[in-house]
Amino acid sequence: MIKKVVYTTIFGGYDDLVEPHYIPDGWDFICFTDDSNLKSDAWKIVKTKTFYNDNTRNAKQFKVLPHRHLSDYDYSIFIDGNMTIRNNPDELIDNYLNSSNIAFFNHNKNLLDPRDCIYKEAEVIFEFGKRNGNYKDNPELIKSQMQTYQDEGYPKNNGLITGMVILRKHNEKDCIVMMEDWWTEIKYHSRRDQLVLIMLLGKTK
């Protein structure tokens, strides 16, 4: 029997868990969290220990590595903690995972904020930090990482994913390799995951 899961992560009280508007047959809903008081009627709350002094990385290891934490499932859909399911997720699986083991949404299709470049994404992060006095990550770390990619010849305007929703056959070998590489970049460099994955995908083509 094929097992399917929608999952999310909430660490450090960053998001308020949103109940799904639609609960399809054959799907489980799991939330990984460090919050012992988090409750839900629809989500299975999985309280887990933290591994880092960084709530973002604590959350992203579950986001990026479902093969480690959800190996009993064949298909997974990750959604950000502030998002909800409104329609049948089987349609997403049928539309996007028939010929691929992983699928993301294209940031350049975002009508309000289209972007297609990791270097532009880094600039937006810098501008946001300057404007608000609160950087989403160490700007010097991001600058160093982007310089490394430039030195390796990674081109501008080569695409950008949005990481709010990820569809995966996460136990497939190529998906596991990609996710482990993605996690290595996040673990040792910037935690801004959108800066990394499209570059890794480019290297595998």
Which ranges hold each PLM region?
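N-terminal anchoring/stem segment of glycosyltransferases
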Residues: 1-60, 69-73, 188-191, 203-205
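Residues that flank catalytic or metal-binding motifs in active/ligand-binding sites
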Residues: 2, 25, 63, 79, ...
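A short acidic, amphipathic alpha-helical/loop segment
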Residues: 18-20, 66, 89-95
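Short acidic (Asp/Glu) patches
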Residues: 57-65, 91-92, 141-150
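Short aromatic/hydrophobic "clamp" motif used to bind/position activated sugar donors
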Residues: 76
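The conserved acidic donor/metal-binding loop of glycosyltransferases
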Residues: 80-84
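Conserved donor-nucleotide/metal-binding helix-loop-beta segment in metal-dependent transferases, i.e.
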Residues: 85-125
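Catalytic core and acceptor-binding pocket of nucleotide-sugar-dependent glycosyltransferases
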Residues: 129-205
